[in-house]
Amino acid sequence: MHDILEPRHHMIDYVEFASADPQTMCVFYEATLGWSFEWFGPDYVAFHGAGLEGGIYRADIVSRSADGGALIVLNSRDLEASEALVLSHGANI
């Protein structure tokens, strides 16, 4: 189970990401960032533990920052260690 975040006035409350392969995204984010996931059928999953609640849905067309999509910035207390961790799980930086 997860804690529900208290809604904050005029703050982003929930974000959704399109993915051709939500399962692979979940495996990556769980292994690298410790997020947890709650599936609602095979094509939608909510994520928790990211500092913001959100979801991932299966889609044939996905947004990419290079094409003008949103750029999401994650914080790290140890950038080199975080970089090594995500690279070890197949990320491209």
What are these regions (language model features)?
Residues L5, A59-R64, N92-I93:
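A general structural signal for short secondary-structure boundary/capping elements
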Residues M25-E30, V86:
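Conserved active-site tyrosine of GNAT-family acetyltransferases
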Residues A31-F37, G90-I93:
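Conserved acetyl-CoA-binding loop of GNAT-fold acetyltransferases
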Residues M1-C26, G69-L74:
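N-terminal beta-strand motif that seeds the catalytic metal site of vicinal oxygen chelate
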Residues D21-P22, I72-I93:
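Vicinal oxygen chelate
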Residues L5-R8, E30, G49, S65:
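Generic structural signal for beta-strand residues in well-ordered domains
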Residues W35-G69:
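Conserved short beta-strand elements that form part of the metal-binding/catalytic scaffold
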